[in-house]
């Protein structure tokens, strides 16, 4: 797998250290641009063993698009990534990490509805958590259907759910994602992006637009 492109942190990022089941979890909280809505979105990063982190450009663009819609965002590093303690645990420990981050968000931002989002491996982890943590909405970007991660027996949310998939994805089969979405009893909205690779090279602005358009109807009144 090609190493994920990275993002250079700016001073706008507010660093956090959250207590997690494997030790401290490195995170970054960002207020929305302009008028703030009572929503907080947690965005999960791609596979740690392939260079995935909260600084991945798809993750940061997702967070940027949401902030432009008035949504606060929280990115974090799974165990063993960056300053987060612990070691990779094939998704189960990472799910526990997300649970801990959700717990922090609920305690510190109890006035906000909780959205979950994720890219690739992060899309799988966030989907696994969505029903349990009562997420109010879900964004899944290039969910790794047909890869190493089983989508069988995952409780599926009945909340607003957006799936974005590049048609030229060299890692996740766009056809497999389309078939999976079509097989669901209550399928999410699927947006297919022509010419987009797994990491959305030269398509990040298009991704930003797809996210903004996709969540517009979910936004509460200011």
Which functions belong to the PLM regions below?
Residues 1-36:
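N-terminal cap/lid segment of alpha/beta-hydrolase-fold proteins
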Residues 34-75:
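Short, surface-exposed "cap/lid" segments of acyl-processing enzymes
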Residues 88-109:
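Alpha/beta-hydrolase active-site loop
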Residues 117-126:
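Gly/Ala-rich beta-loop-alpha elbow adjacent to hydrolase catalytic centers
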Residues 157-158, 162-165, 169:
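Short beta-strand/loop motif that positions the catalytic acidic residue
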Residues 167-172, 198-199:
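Acidic catalytic loop of the alpha/beta-hydrolase fold
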Residues 183-199:
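Catalytic histidine neighborhood in serine/cysteine hydrolases
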